[in-house]
Each structure stands twice: as structure tokens, then as C-alpha cells.
């Protein structure tokens, strides 16, 4: 424990919190271009083929981003919007692609949680 005079001389250092999405550079979203679109398998004990894309951002970073929802229209050179948010069972994937923005189409036939997947409200009869 420091003495009063040590505190007067040096003071306390504030601990800077580490960003969970450093490639965004404090922005809410960033635009980027898909370089690779592929599937990967999650960590144990889960089993699936998760859809991910490697995205080169406008600030020069290249990151892996998860493609949420069932089915997608993304391919190489698609322009996408990414947001922060990791996928717990995919190591190294710390970003999500925003569905329904730029070249990424919304999820078809989605009725619940539509705003998260860029799906329009279905027509009423």
C-alpha cells in the first residue's frame, strides 16, 4: 500500500478497459468487402456448420464475421456491414454481419425477431 507522499508524487493509474471489438475503432458498425465465405465447425460439445465470412474493412483490418440466420446470399466481393458481438463457440469470430444492410439480404420467411435479421413484415390477408 502506498504512502500519502507516494500518492501525491505518482497518483493512481486508471486501468483502461480492453475493447471486445478492436477493429471497429469505437464505431458502432463498419463497412467491408467479403474476401472468403465459408463454413466452420464449432468447439466441443457443439456440432454444426456455421457460416462465416472473412471481411476486409474500410480501415484496412481483415476480420472473421458470423453470418446469422438461415440461408444467405453472400459471396466473394459482397459489400457488408459488420457490428461487434462474438460467437461463443467459434474461436476468433468477434463480429456479426448485419442482415438486410448493403449487399446482405434479410432472412426469408422470418416471422419472429424480424428486426435482428432484416426481414420485412409479411403482408396481411
From Swiss-Prot:
Q: Which GO terms describe its molecular function?
A: rRNA binding; structural constituent of ribosome; tRNA binding
Q: Which UniProt keywords apply?
A: Methylation, Ribonucleoprotein, Ribosomal protein, RNA-binding, rRNA-binding, tRNA-binding
Q: Which InterPro entries match?
A: NA-bd_OB-fold, Ribosomal_uS12, Ribosomal_uS12_bac
Q: Which SUPFAM superfamilies match?
A: Nucleic acid-binding proteins
Q: Which residues carry this modification: 3-methylthioaspartic acid?
A: 89
List the GO cellular component terms.
small ribosomal subunit
Q: Which PROSITE patterns match?
A: RIBOSOMAL_S12
Q: Which Pfam families match?
A: Ribosom_S12_S23 (PF00164)
Looking at the record's lineage, which domain of life comes first? Bacteria
| One example of a Gene Ontology biological process annotation | translation
This chain's function reads: With S4 and S5 plays an important role in translational accuracy.
Q: How does it assemble?
A: Part of the 30S ribosomal subunit. Contacts proteins S8 and S17. May interact with IF1 in the 30S initiation complex.
What family is it from? Belongs to the universal ribosomal protein uS12 family.
Protein name per its UniProtKB record: Small ribosomal subunit protein uS12
Source organism phylogeny: Bacteria, Bacillati, Bacillota, Clostridia, Eubacteriales
Amino acid at each position: 500500500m502506498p504512502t500519502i507522499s507516494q500518492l501525491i508524487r505518482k497518483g493512481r493509474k486508471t486501468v483502461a478497459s480492453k475493447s471486445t471489438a478492436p477493429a471497429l475503432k469505437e464505431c458502432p458498425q463498419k463497412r467491408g468487402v467479403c474476401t472468403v465465405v465459408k463454413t466452420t465447425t464449432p468447439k466441443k460439445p457443439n456440432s454444426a456448420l456455421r457460416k462465416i465470412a472473412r471481411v476486409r474493412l474500410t480501415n484496412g483490418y481483415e476480420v472473421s464475421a458470423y453470418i446469422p440466420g438461415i440461408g444467405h446470399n453472400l459471396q466473394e466481393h459482397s459489400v457488408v456491414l459488420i457490428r461487434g458481438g462474438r460467437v461463443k463457440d467459434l474461436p476468433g469470430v468477434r463480429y456479426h454481419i448485419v442482415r438486410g444492410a448493403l449487399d446482405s439480404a434479410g432472412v426469408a420467411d422470418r416471422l419472429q425477431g424480424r428486426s435482428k435479421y432484416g426481414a420485412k413484415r409479411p403482408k396481411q390477408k
